[in-house]
């Protein structure tokens, strides 16, 4: 019984940085470009405000191309990830797990726990465990499984355990099964949308080669670099759904919320700390 109440206490106290300290955000994706798709705009805003952001690709992306494979592709995708990080002003780690082979094993879970602790994360971003692709699906499971373990000293004992469980958030993904994402937090991207597209543009192997090829639309990709970015912006800026619009209005007020054209949205995971609205505003200082 005592342990139950202790866990509830950990979940209801959101991790807040001390006055004047940086907010520390770590985002997990299955492949080197996944974090960028779901959170590059939010990352840019955090970075511009002097906070610390790290993207982590849980696999090395060595299978996602129609021509390149293995080590050659992994090295190219690492270079692309580092260029994206440079453009956003953040850190980017790419782990060595193979693309298409990720499993929610204890070994990979320990990698996730270690990274969250080493980053001393206040906020952890990850996919929901319901993707069509097994790698993002299992990335979601791995991060969920790490959520409580980051405060357990005997697990990964070589890295000091966190004192409080961070806020864990799911990316918006568009999937309806088992249930659609609930946009608890919606971030207005109008001031940084070009920076987000610039980050995506770093991943040439994906957005201009592999993904158009696998969709049967490679011939639609423009050759001119400036035209490519305009094309990519159209591909990667979804329409704002009514529930997202309502969330934007909640956080930004009617004028800014209703005029927003671009966004990223997140759902609070019940396995992490449960912040109230006041604490969300402290952790997301751009919500104003």
Where are these regions (language model features)?
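Short, Lys/Arg-enriched N-terminal segments with co-localized hydrophobic residues
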Residues: 1-2
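Sec-dependent N-terminal signal peptides
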Residues: 5-14
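Active-site rim/loop-helix segments in enzyme catalytic domains that contact anionic ligands
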Residues: 18-119, 141, 149
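A short helix->loop->beta-strand "cap" motif at the edges of active sites that frequently abuts
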Residues: 51, 163-167
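Short acidic, glycine/proline-rich loop/turn micro-motifs
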Residues: 65-68, 179-183
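Active-site adenylate/phosphate-handling loop in enzymes that bind or generate adenylated species
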Residues: 115-161
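Functional cores that coordinate and move charged inorganic groups
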Residues: 136, 141, 170, 185-187
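C-terminal accessory domains and tails appended to enzymatic cores
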Residues: 152-157, 162-164, 179, 185-288
């Amino acid at each position: 019984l005592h342990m139950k109440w202790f866990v509830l206490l950990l979940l209801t106290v959101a991790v807040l940085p001390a006055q004047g300290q940086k907010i520390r955000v770590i985002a997990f994706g299955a492949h080197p470009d996944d974090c960028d798709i779901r959170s590059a705009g939010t990352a840019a805003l955090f970075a511009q405000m002097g906070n610390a952001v790290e993207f982590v690709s849980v696999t090395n992306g060595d299978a996602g191309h129609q021509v390149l494979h293995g080590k050659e592709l992994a090295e190219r995708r690492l270079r692309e990830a580092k260029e994206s990080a440079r453009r956003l002003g953040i850190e980017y780690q790419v782990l060595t797990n193979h693309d298409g082979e990720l499993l929610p094993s204890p070994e990979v879970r320990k990698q996730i726990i270690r990274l969250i602790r080493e980053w001393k994360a206040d906020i952890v971003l990850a996919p929901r465990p319901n993707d069509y692709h097994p790698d993002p699906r299992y990335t979601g499971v791995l991060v969920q499984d790490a959520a409580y373990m980051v405060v357990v000293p005997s697990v990964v004992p070589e890295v000091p355990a966190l004192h409080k469980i961070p806020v864990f958030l799911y990316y918006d993904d568009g999937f309806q099964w088992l249930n659609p994402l609930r946009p608890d937090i919606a971030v207005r991207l109008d001031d940084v949308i070009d920076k987000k597209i610039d980050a995506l543009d770093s991943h040439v192997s994906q957005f201009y080669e592999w993904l158009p090829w696998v969709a049967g639309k490679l011939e639609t990709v423009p050759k001119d670099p400036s035209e490519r970015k305009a094309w990519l912006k159209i591909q990667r800026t979804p329409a704002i759904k009514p529930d997202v619009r309502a969330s934007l209005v909640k956080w930004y007020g009617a004028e800014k919320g209703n005029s927003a054209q671009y966004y990223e949205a997140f759902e609070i995971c019940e396995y992490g700390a449960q912040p109230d609205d006041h604490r969300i505003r402290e952790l997301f200082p751009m919500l104003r």
